[in-house]
A protein has these predicted regions:
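Anionic-ligand binding patches
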Residues: 2-6, 10-31, 35-209
């Protein structure tokens, strides 16, 4: 029987992307919906790290299985690091990706390229179901990845999700391709989530996944 690992999300995009990034052939990856987990954790942390911890602990306690949680978002220099932990709800609790993108573009309207710097941030947290951290008592393990770039003038590309259509990764010229125009393979080579996943993978391997 393959070991079971919960990916503490209801986002089909995050579940698919983390599955592709972690490539845990020996493990069965399950979402909260796969396991019929009701309710949602209260994401009231002030940082990505805090919210990743909250979500990982919620999932591990609810399922009695090891759980990996992702908390991620975008930090814009001109907004003093905003939207930050409010990334998903930037334009409101029920906002779509398009709503959030439009609000961010509006907030930066008129700013020159040099002032549109931003970075994607991802924190992954691993929690075990009995309150222990990995390796029998150490604190919950977290891994962090970032991807530097800038906010485009307008959306381009239908790939990815979130703010990908308005995020030009570092290395692209102004007006160059956004993450929404990258293939999945290209995105996985540089994205914040990919970098965090590469750092978390040895930890998961160590624990039999």
């Amino acid at each position: 029987m393959r070991p079971r690992l919960v990916i503490a999300t209801r986002s089909v995009h995050k579940l698919r992307e983390l599955g592709e990034l972690l490539r845990l052939e020996r493990a069965e990856l399950l979402s909260l919906d796969d396991l019929g987990v009701p309710g949602e954790p209260v994401e009231d942390g002030a940082t990505f790290q805090a919210n990743a911890r909250i979500k990982a602990r919620f999932a591990a306690d609810a399922t009695n299985l090891p759980s990996v949680a992702d908390d991620s978002g975008i930090e814009v220099d001109a907004l003093d690091g905003g939207p930050g932990v409010w990334t998903r709800r930037y334009a409101g609790p029920q906002a779509t990706d398009e709503d959030n993108n439009a609000k961010l573009l509006g907030a930066l309207r008129g700013l020159p390229v040099a002032e549109r710097g931003a970075r994607y941030v991802c924190v992954l947290a691993l929690a075990l179901p009995d309150g222990r951290g990995p390796r029998g008592g150490l604190p919950m393990i977290l891994r962090r990845g970032t991807c530097r770039g800038r906010i485009a003038i307008e959306p381009r590309g239908a790939g990815g999700f979130g703010y990908d259509p308005i995020f030009e990764p570092a290395g692209e010229p102004p007006g160059g391709r956004t993450l929404g125009e990258y293939s999945a393979e290209e995105k996985h080579a540089i994205s914040h989530r990919a970098r965090a996943a590469r750092l978390m993978l040895p930890v998961l391997r160590e624990h039999g996944f």
